[in-house]
Amino acid sequence: MNIEKIKDTLLECYSKDLCYPKMQYRWNNDNKYFGMSLITDLIVNDYFGGNICKIYVTGISHYYNLIDNEIIDLTSKQFNFDIDYKNYEIINREKILTDDTKYRYNILKKRLVNKLLKQVDEEVFNCKLCDKLVDKFPNDTTVFIGKNNDMVLVGEAPANNGWRKSHKLWKDVNDKVLPSGVVLQKLFDIIDREIFETTFLESVKCYPLERKNLKICSKNCKNIMLEQLKILNPKLIITLGEFPTRNLLDFKFDKFADVVGNTYEVNSYKILPIYHPSPISPKCYSGNVPIFEKVRNIW
């Protein structure tokens, strides 16, 4: 994911209702960038950091990003002339997040994330690397979007009787919560969260016909998983079990017990491995309780 991809996808997301309210009467499909600078720059800041800057163009407030001393202005095309960026002011992000701005920004961010994830899902559905090793995932999306994406759960692979058949995360075809979901919700009760409101994706996107295929499938799916995580941009990633943990940590470890419960920072992500919540695992609940108590104290 890069700036240009963000720019192209945002253009598909703009609409009149997201334009700065006092300027909405001037917005049209021939100039979709109009009135979108601030909420656009907030999103760029989310993904790439740097500063948000403010200038005045023909007496109107205009915002852009300054990243490593490089001007990034994704909405400059709303003007039919070159912009003078000399007299700028660096803006405090929190001060410009008024209720209206936050509302429009959240809508735009949600649209962007959904479109970017859909593009990745198209890669998944067209992928043939594991054709003889898996049953293709039949759902129209490989990511479950929760209430927000500050915390993302990463599982091993779709369960045989799970959402690949029920089309409902953590539930079987009879709409009954899976045993893993029951255990995980008990753990989530510790941090006062709902598993059905928490974003989730699998390390392996399709259903491996044999467990021995998990390793090669994890390798084949790694770049797709990383792209999805870049789009979601979580504050904390919780990996469920050994395979997603090995796929995400940038170092090798001998025993899963050596890393479980510790927090690691990899590519600006905080990664927290836990024991898989499946009742098959002897530490599915008791081994995870101290981990979630720690999360409760820092989250």
Predicted region positions:
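A polyanion-binding, active-site-adjacent surface
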Residues: 117-299
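A structural boundary/capping signal
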Residues: 1-116
